[in-house]
């Protein structure tokens, strides 16, 4: 029997308009009533994710910044991982041949140099989380959890080649969304963060289930006892984890539908969405 459920937020738990549907909210509360540990694992900043949970009346553990931060259910930070100072310095000061915009995440917030398009801000309407305009090269080299590049996917694929050539195996690169490429501390991902959290709680990864849709969910989905892939997941994720169940679309609150079946039949081995 699984004792912890971990959920990606955007594209998984949230609908395309970045809201939590009523069925999803109800099933999350059912899990809490069953004394399951509920964990939200997201690329979002803590200052973005926590207000969403508070508004919904949810209390759970938080993995934020794609594994760079871990918080307990009272909001106490359990683990923090930053880019090494020399690497952060190189990311911020190297001239990358790209039109993608650069965004830096620190405990104090989201930093960028230019105004962010309104469509990017829609994802943060529930929390009110907003960027801070600053000259990125003036940021301290210490305390930078991750750097995100936003732009068209084809542009980011070219940038990914540059970053791999420059850093080799000194960082992890990950597509957290089709139009978002992230530079993360080496070995830092949702899977490693969930492993740390599960050990903190006295659990094994085999006792955890997880849901996700993007490449930043790959390690988490691959290492838990039961990983579930969204129907709207990136094709790369589905091809890399062909052994995992695929359920419906986040627009139809597929996580809620799946869990409603699972709560009635915990040993369910097929997807009720298909």
Swiss-Prot record:
Gene3D superfamilies: 3.30.1240.10, HAD superfamily/HAD-like. It comes from the Bacteria. Coiled coil: none annotated. Mg(2+) binds at residues 8, 10, 213. GO terms for molecular function: 4-amino-5-hydroxymethyl-2-methylpyrimidine diphosphatase activity; magnesium ion binding; phosphatase activity. It catalyses: 4-amino-2-methyl-5-(diphosphooxymethyl)pyrimidine + H2O = 4-amino-2-methyl-5-(phosphooxymethyl)pyrimidine + phosphate + H(+). Keywords: Hydrolase, Magnesium, Metal-binding. Catalyzes the hydrolysis of 4-amino-2-methyl-5-hydroxymethylpyrimidine pyrophosphate (HMP-PP) to 4-amino-2-methyl-5-hydroxymethylpyrimidine phosphate (HMP-P). This is HMP-PP phosphatase. It comes from Serratia proteamaculans (strain 568). The gene is cof.
């Amino acid at each position: 029997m699984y004792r912890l459920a971990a959920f990606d937020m955007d594209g998984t738990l949230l609908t395309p308009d970045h809201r939590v549907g009523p069925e999803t909210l109800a099933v999350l509360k059912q899990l809490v009533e069953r004394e399951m540990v509920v964990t939200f694992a997201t690329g979002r900043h803590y200052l973005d994710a926590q207000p969403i949970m508070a508004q919904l009346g949810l209390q759970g553990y938080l993995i934020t910044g794609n594994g760079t931060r871990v918080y307990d259910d009272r909001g106490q930070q359990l683990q923090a991982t930053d880019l090494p100072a020399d690497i952060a310095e190189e990311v911020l000061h190297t001239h990358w041949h790209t039109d993608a915009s650069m965004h830096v995440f620190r405990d104090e917030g989201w930093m960028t140099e230019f105004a962010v398009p309104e469509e990017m801000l829609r994802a943060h309407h529930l929390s009110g989380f907003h960027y801070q305009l600053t000259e990125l090269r003036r940021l301290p080299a210490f305390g930078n959890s991750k750097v995100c590049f936003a732009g068209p996917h084809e542009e980011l694929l070219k940038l990914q080649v540059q970053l791999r050539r420059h850093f080799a195996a000194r960082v992890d690169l990950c597509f957290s969304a089709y139009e978002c490429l992230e530079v993360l501390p080496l070995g830092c991902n949702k899977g490693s963060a969930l492993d740390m959290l599960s050990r903190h709680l006295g659990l094994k990864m085999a006792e955890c289930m997880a849901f996700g849709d993007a490449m930043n969910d790959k390690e988490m989905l691959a290492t838990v006892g039961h990983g579930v892939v969204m129907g709207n997941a990136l094709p790369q994720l589905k091809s890399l984890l062909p052994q995992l169940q695929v359920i419906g679309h986040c627009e139809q609150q597929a996580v809620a539908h799946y869990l409603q079946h699972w709560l009635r039949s915990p040993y369910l081995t097929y997807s009720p969405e298909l």
